[in-house]
Amino acid sequence: MQNIKCVVVGDGAVGKTCMLISYTTNGFPSEYLPTVFDNYCANLMLDGKPYSLGLWDTAGQEEYDRLRPLSYPQTDVFLICFSIISQSSFENVSTKWFKEVNHHAPGVPIVLVGTKQDIRNDNDSIKKLKERNIELVPYEKGLEKAKEINAIYLEASALTQRGVKNVFDQCIRSVIYPNKLNKKPKKKTCTIM
């Protein structure tokens, strides 16, 4: 059985822990408890082969900025999460999270996840958000950001479990098929004769 280490990062309260609990227990937590550090493990079959997926849940709060990178050594894949209802968490993907993981673990595959995807189809929630001048991060912006950081982009909802299994399947695939999923842009060369 191949072991794969997946470290989950992103701003506080974007839904990292909820997504992990939803995936590992098929349930949704009833209250928000900020994470300091947690581990989960999922044994599964993918493409006919067994895997042990070690899931490392990290704290997104600034006060853990010095502690969090201690979980990065030997990481096989990073999940960078943002909430589709939080522009600041989306902006922090490139200004904080990508910089941090790329500094400590350059070249490790990344899956970018827009959480709380169920809200896209909930007109009541969208109306309430608009009343508070909160715009959803468009799906296309997520795709653009993923391309910018050389990541795969997915959206998921821990509440409805839509897309959650696919997120973790893609984490495994990005490790076992690295060149197929995380294509690096080809560098152009200049030859002088």
UniProtKB/Swiss-Prot annotation:
Keyword terms: Cell membrane, GTP-binding, Lipoprotein, Membrane, Methylation, Nucleotide-binding, Prenylation
GO MF annotations in UniProt: GTP binding; GTPase activity; protein kinase binding
Record GO biological process: actin filament organization; aggregation involved in sorocarp development; cell-cell adhesion; cortical cytoskeleton organization; establishment or maintenance of cell polarity; mitotic cytokinesis; regulation of actin cytoskeleton organization; regulation of cell shape
Propeptide: 191-193
One annotated Gene Ontology cellular component of this protein: cytoskeleton
Alphabetical list of InterPro entries matching this protein: P-loop_NTPase, Small_GTP-bd, Small_GTPase, Small_GTPase_Rho
Main location: membrane
Membrane topology annotation: Lipid-anchor
Alphabetical list of CDD domains matching this protein: Rho (cd00157)
PANTHER family per record: RHO FAMILY GTPASE
Record protein name field: Rho-related protein racF2
Organism, as annotated: Dictyostelium discoideum (Social amoeba)
